[in-house]
Amino acid sequence: RGLRSIQWLRGLREDVGRKAPLYFSDWRDGLTRKSLAAISFLFFACFAPVIAFGGAMGALTGGAMGVSEVLVSCGLSGMAYAALAGQPMTFVGPTGLTLAFTAALYQWCTFMSLPFLPMYAWVGCWTSLMLVVASMANASGLIRYCTRFTEDVFNALLAFNFLSEALRSLATEFVDASRGFLAFDTALITAWLCQTTAAFRNKRYLSAGAREAVSDFGPAAVIVGVTAVSLLPAVQRLGDFARLSMPSTFGLSGGRELFVNMLALPAHFRWFAAFPAVFLAVLFFLDQNITVRTVNSPSNNLKKGAAYHLDLATLGLLTGGASVVGLPWMCSATVQSLNHVRAMSLGSDGTEVVETRVTGFGVHAAILASALILPSFSAVPLPVISGVFLYLGQKVMKGNQFLQRCKTVWLDEDRLNIDCQDERQMVVLGRGAVARFTAIQALCLAALWALKLNPATALIFPSV
């Protein structure tokens, strides 16, 4: 009775019917100078995380995937998503939890002496099927049961994963004390410069346009600047840096063929791949819908409406396509998507937004084109990548009410500021109620982190 009661394809039909009449205007409305300006700085805002994730991906998968694959996957997936999805203001890209799942899958394949890429392809294809079926069954409607409680724990987990990967990479540099401290200082300087430049729009220096330019171009400029400084002879005399491992010419890692030989995986493991795929599908379902819901928030003043089911179906198809050619999976990226909405806002109050497919398509086309200068990325020190991860972790923490309550619960009751929402909760609800609620969230986060640390459960950790 449960399956028969599902109105199959209803949500997809409604999304397509609502979005099809607007499709031409989605492209036409973006043919402006504002879109060109937005593409130029959104490229740099998206490019820095792509390079960071590419470097981490290479280290965590034994070189099976690297910067080349992340660039190509992000570029192609982003262009396809901009052209096909219902909400073009959402950007797709590499995410921390997807990286964690991929790393856990690689470790499990190594432990079981299984070929990684064939297993990866089967898991991705099963996930693709599950996401498409979920979109056909109108499952995105379930996201209304996802509350701020879940979102805060989810974002805290994402932030901690960024910080963990950064510190893990830096720890490997401490085989020599001087090299380790040089790497640690470089990462801290990179993180501080990224944070400072990204927040420059809130300063009082220079003109509004100049502040916006510094803020938007800042993180990518920091990577270039710190890399250039690391190549100076005076700095190199202080110690050597581990740098990104890049091929001399563009190509897939290890010189492999484009399509993964999926038949190289034993037959019974092809069916077993559906088990981890369930957890990856849950992760993508939550990440995708939470991000798109954030983009469609009434505070962003979007007028053309949401299309959750069509967005999920598009992501499912992209996941399947990336899997069969062994490219990293992409998912909706919250920070980049919100930057896109802000970049296309009109006026200082942002009461109107140009909703277009041009910018998303253009940004990811530029990311794909950057693969032509791939060898130059081999100069980037790995501590710079760690610094970008530290910055991203700090950025995800910002505005997280759970993490803010972890601090305010210790404040002196006589010194609480009722004008601050988190501190006002302490006054209205009482310290005990706030502390118990925060403790439950902390226990959930700790349980998830314990799953990550246990090799036997690392595969299911990102989606639990």
At which residue positions do the language-model features occur?
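Transmembrane helical cores of multi-pass ion-transport proteins
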Residues: 1-464
